[in-house]
Amino acid sequence: MILFMIVYISVSKAYSWKKIRLKKYPIIGWLAVIIFQGGYTFLLVSMACENNFTISWFTLQKIEGMLLSTMLIGAYYPLTQIYQHNEDSQRGDFTISYRLGIKGTFIFSAIMFLISFVIAYCYFNKYFDSFQFYIFGLCLIPAILYFLYWFIKTIKDIREANFTHTMRMTFLSSTCLLIGFLILFYLNHMLKSV
């Protein structure tokens, strides 16, 4: 587990450390973030919960879970950079959000979210049931509505692509995901033990 953590910390440092600064490369930086904050984090948490750090952990279900986690982070992460394009460009950091532009970032994120939802639908149907997917989707409705509201506001006034909206989106989507996962945990574990 320590080795896995060292790898995670090393990539995180490489993302913003002046001598390497993966952040200045749009695709490489984005891939580093989404893989390590998405699929790799899924791997670490799942391995730790199961106390299984062997090759036997890598089942198709777990790999597909890693893919879903990576795609969700891939959809969301560019939105966290949307308000800092000027600051990033002054440092020479040409992030994926900077390259896409503000409107392009919203469109890119929307497409990635749609792909993520298709993957989630397939994942839940394959390993659980569609009812659980619908619970997951319902819990995300407030975040989806806020995303659309923020996008419309930003189209009308580019200054709406700011820190405040980014943090609101972060808080709302995190809260919605947490509630969704708690409900799914309850359905899958607590009800079965009753």
PLM regions: where:
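Transmembrane helix-loop-helix
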Residues: M1-I20, A110-T164
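Juxtamembrane boundary at the C-terminal end of a transmembrane helix
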Residues: L182-V194
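Membrane-embedded alpha-helical segments that form the functional core of polytopic membrane enzymes
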Residues: M1-K13, S56-L79
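Intramembrane alpha-helical segments
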Residues: M1-F53
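Small-residue-rich segments of transmembrane alpha-helices in multi-pass membrane proteins
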Residues: W30-S46, Y98-I102, T164-I179
